């Protein structure tokens, strides 16, 4: 199931970019259908009737959307909503009495309670949680701004307004479906290198770091996302 979901996740930005750059309604519907499958994959594989009903209803709706002049419009908002949601997930853990999200992850990697982490590591992981929340919020706003001024078919253009500055749909799509992921990936790798320098001896390599994250298991990640 993990591999299937990962393949679907990798397929989405490709489909979304091609749909956005070409203004292709069929590809847009396929990209949105890909998202539906990502969300419903587990209950679909378990044969849940409600999941199949939702999937069939979504498929019917996307079939009609594919032929609409507004078929690519939802793709403008998907990167904004998804990135903003992840930024919120980081930010909500920074409130009083909460354990910052990165602190919880590092404590799990260290095999101890968050309060048992060394004070410098606790401070670092809190600052890192702030950094991720800010970076993702900025990316969400950038996605929204570019979606608004994309021509043709951007948010302002769709409302009949002429944007003060404009980018092409292809330029918006490259940022939303490629460059944004590159920024996140680069920040992730860069932070690993910084952490390895500041707190040496914890990970043998980047591959070891990823392996240890994976070994935390689905139950840990589900609980983490629930907050």
Predicted regions and their residues:
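Structural motif marking the loop-to-transmembrane transition
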Residues: 3, 25, 46-50, 73, ...
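Lipid-exposed faces of alpha-helical membrane segments in multi-pass integral membrane proteins
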Residues: 7, 11, 33-37, 54-58, ...
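Residue-level signal for alpha-helical transmembrane segments in multi-pass membrane proteins
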Residues: 11, 15-18, 37-44, 61-62, ...
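C-terminal membrane-adjacent module
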Residues: 114-227
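Long, highly hydrophobic alpha-helical transmembrane signal-anchor segments
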Residues: 41-85, 155-169
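N-terminal membrane topogenic signal
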Residues: 1-7
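Membrane-proximal helix-loop-helix units in multi-pass membrane proteins
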Residues: 73-132
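Structural signature of hydrophobic alpha-helical transmembrane segments
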Residues: 16-33
């Amino acid at each position: 199931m993990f591999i299937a979901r990962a393949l679907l996740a990798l397929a989405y930005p490709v489909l979304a970019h091609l749909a956005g750059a070409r203004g292709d309604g069929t590809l847009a519907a396929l990209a949105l259908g890909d998202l539906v499958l990502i969300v419903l994959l587990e209950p679909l594989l378990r044969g849940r009737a409600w999941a199949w009903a939702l999937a069939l209803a979504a498929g019917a709706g996307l079939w009609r959307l594919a032929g609409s002049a507004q078929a690519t419009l939802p793709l403008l908002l998907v990167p904004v909503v998804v990135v903003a949601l992840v930024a919120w997930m980081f930010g909500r853990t920074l409130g009083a009495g909460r354990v910052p999200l990165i602190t919880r992850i590092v404590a799990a990697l260290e095999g101890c309670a968050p309060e048992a982490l060394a004070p410098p590591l606790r401070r670092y992981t809190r600052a890192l949680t702030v950094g991720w929340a800010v970076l993702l919020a900025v990316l969400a706003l950038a996605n929204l701004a570019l979606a608004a001024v994309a021509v043709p078919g951007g948010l302002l253009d769709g409302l009949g307004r002429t944007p003060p500055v404009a980018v092409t749909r292809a330029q918006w799509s490259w940022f939303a479906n490629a460059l944004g992921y590159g920024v996140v990936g680069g920040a992730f790798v860069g932070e690993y290198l910084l952490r390895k320098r500041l707190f040496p001896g914890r990970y043998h390599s980047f591959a070891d770091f990823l392996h240890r994250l994976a070994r935390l298991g689905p139950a840990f990640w589900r609980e983490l996302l629930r907050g």
